[in-house]
Regions:
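Hydrophobic alpha-helical and helix-loop surface patches within well-folded domains
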Residues: 1-197
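Long, ordered, helix-rich scaffold segments
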Residues: 102-108, 125, 136-142, 154-277
């Protein structure tokens, strides 16, 4: 679907959306998933390529922030999506795209490729990816075709790192394998600490250095606010940061989820406007 309107924040802060769509030139257009159950070959691979591109545009710290948010959204999906839909390649008897629930195929797919990169090293994994796109150019493939290619082109030539069984645990099991990577970000941890300090009254909003923050840090701050925070403090935050009127669609989405969950009625009208964009 087209996200161009929400990608225009006016400050180039949502370049990742553009990077994602550009990456579809390879995963999605050049090599296409054969069925909806193989959607991770489209969106998961694209999300991984997006992160690699963002590392070039910005730096590793920014990418770490985005990976943490992706991981947190994935865990949130696990709370609501049935176990048999948490597989990367779930059984879809109907073949209906609507049966691919949530955004698991984006985030779990990206994390799976990061797992492979971590295990085999970037140079070796990049060589595999180049070969993958070359060998399957202008073709549609299934998960099982990919797994056979992965085994022949990466697992077997580099024994003792990742087994076929470990890969299949990602494909055909709910949740995440025990050895899945857990992203971390020092800047997002700082934002979470600031959220806790402000909520407890240890610091004031004016003392929080938001001028040096990325949108991801603001999002993490909002998501880190305790559940028992008073409506008065939430309104104070909205007034100070202009959350209900922000032009950044991702920050707005995060804030309005809080508005809905916490019943912040004074922000209902801006939320309606946001939803009707």
């Amino acid at each position: 679907y087209n996200r161009n309107q929400t990608a225009i924040a006016g400050d180039r802060s949502l370049v990742s959306v553009v990077a994602h769509e550009l990456a579809h030139s390879w995963s999605g257009n050049l090599v296409t998933n054969a069925t909806w159950r193989d959607s991770w070959l489209n969106e998961g691979v694209t999300s991984y390529l997006e992160a690699r591109r963002m590392e070039i545009i910005y730096d590793r710290d920014r990418v770490d922030e985005e990976r943490v948010l992706s991981y947190e959204e994935l865990l949130g999906n696990f709370d609501t999506v049935p176990l048999d839909r948490q597989w990367l390649a779930p059984r879809l008897e109907s073949g209906d795209a609507d049966d691919v629930q949530g955004t698991i195929h984006y985030h779990k797919g990206q994390l799976f490729l990061q797992y492979l990169e971590n295990g085999f090293g970037r140079e070796v994994f990049d060589e595999f990816l180049f070969g993958y796109f070359e060998d399957f150019a202008f073709k549609t493939i299934t998960t099982e075709i990919f797994l056979d290619y992965l085994e022949d082109g990466l697992l077997d030539p580099n024994p003792g790192i990742v087994s076929r069984a470990q890969v299949e645990a990602w494909m055909y099991q709910p949740g995440l394998p025990a050895d899945a990577p857990v992203p971390s970000s020092s800047t997002l941890q700082s934002a979470a600490d600031q959220a806790s300090a402000w909520a407890s009254g240890e610091t004031e909003l004016v003392d929080i250095p938001t001028d040096t923050w990325s949108p991801q840090a603001s999002i993490h701050f909002i998501n880190s606010l305790p559940a028992n925070l008073t409506l008065e403090k939430l309104q104070l935050l909205d007034d100070a940061w202009g959350l209900s009127s922000t032009g950044n669609a991702e920050i707005a989405r995060t804030w309005f989820i809080q508005v809905a969950n916490r019943r912040i009625e004074i922000a209902y009208e801006p939320m309606r406007s946001y939803l009707n964009r």
